[in-house]
């Protein structure tokens, strides 16, 4: 909380004038991440480009990515339709096949976290792994 307050230029206790608790902050950040991810993917025409956009967004925003994808999601307090909007480009790229969309998202999420955490060997061709997974 202190780091967030410092970045906002306020004292940590002042955060609670705007939000109830840490969970509300995480929900607001997750909502922002979902909005941004959806926007990043929206103009991409195919699965390869969607994967590239997803990866690039996550690598450029690792903290926000982690808040949105590695904690329980407080769906009851997210803005209506935000998850659907974020998923729409992927769902369109797989012709509405929700099972395939979930599998592709799981692959993309796993590859992304492994890359963010430095878990691939130094000589690994991560681009090739993405291409193989999305083909």
Task: Indicate where each model-derived feature is located.
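Alpha-helical structural segments
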Residues: 7, 24-43, 49-53, 67, ...
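Amphipathic alpha-helical segments that line or abut small-molecule/effector binding pockets
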Residues: 47-63, 102
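Amphipathic alpha-helical packing segments from all-alpha helical-bundle domains
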Residues: 74-103, 124-135
């Amino acid at each position: 909380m202190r780091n967030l307050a410092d970045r906002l230029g306020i004292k940590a206790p002042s955060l609670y004038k705007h939000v109830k608790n840490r969970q509300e902050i995480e929900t607001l950040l997750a909502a922002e991440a979902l909005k941004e991810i959806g926007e990043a993917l929206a103009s991409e025409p195919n699965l390869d480009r969607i994967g590239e956009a997803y990866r690039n967004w996550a690598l450029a925003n690792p903290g926000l990515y982690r808040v949105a994808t590695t904690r329980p999601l407080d769906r009851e307090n997210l803005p209506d339709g935000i998850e659907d909007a974020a998923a729409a480009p992927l769902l369109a790229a797989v012709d509405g096949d929700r099972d395939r969309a979930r599998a592709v998202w799981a692959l993309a999420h796993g590859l992304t976290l492994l890359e963010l955490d430095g878990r691939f060997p130094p000589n690994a061709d991560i681009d090739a792994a993405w291409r193989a997974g999305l083909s």
